[in-house]
Amino acid sequence: MLGAKAWAENRTDEDISRIDAFLLVDMIGDADLKIYRTFPPYVGDEEGDRLWGAVRTLAGPLGLIDNVTDCGGNPGLDIVNFSTTDGVFDDHVPMIDVGIPAIDFIDIRYGENASVWQGYWHTHEDTPDKVSAESLAHIGRLLELGLREGSWLKVQVNQTEPMQHQEEAQASTFGPVVIGAVFTVIALIFVGFLGLHESVRLKR
């Protein structure tokens, strides 16, 4: 985590303000892939809830949630599951410490029926044949869909606001426009009256 800490601490305030999300992808190649919500960020953290909420929203249509039908009409797999939360201090934590919204995609039960931080993790059994291309693809598609949909971006200004401001602007100019029109009509009537009066006077 030293490299992540050094990187985070070297970001300027301007750098940090321009980063909408830091998505750490760590240990997601397990054939028996299970992605649980990790903390920090803790439940109730606004940015953490936003990002994990996006994960849940994206995972359903991709078929990564058990008993949720995917966009192709197929039953979902039990891959993304928020019934359990795991405490994991990983390379995303230094980002959170400096104010960058960050979450961690990680399967800390590496191997079939493995318990927390057990299985093949940090053993000689952690070999390339244990890595599942399908599992990597599942997370890759989720991340890509999130990018395409703008799901990782911070909450944007409500798009109805410009229209609201436009209506307010129209309302604020309506009064002066009406008053101006009324004065114009009065002026025309007055000019017409003067012209008529002058015409009558000349005839006399």
What are these regions (language model features)?
Residues 18, 33-44, 80-158:
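Active-site-adjacent mobile loop/cap segments within catalytic or ligand-binding domains
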Residues 6, 50, 54-58, 94, ...:
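Amphipathic alpha-helical segments that form well-ordered structural scaffolds
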Residues 111, 174-176, 200:
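Short, aromatic- and cysteine-enriched interfacial helices/patches
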Residues 187-204:
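C-terminal membrane-anchoring or membrane-association module
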Residues 11, 15, 26-27, 31, ...:
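Sec/Tat-exported extracytoplasmic proteins
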Residues 1-54:
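Acidic/histidine-rich catalytic neighborhood of metal-dependent amide-processing enzymes
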Residues 159-185:
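Juxtamembrane/start-of-transmembrane alpha-helix segments at the extracytoplasmic/lumenal side
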Residues 24, 42-84:
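Acidic, glycine-rich loop-and-strand cores that form catalytic or ligand-binding grooves
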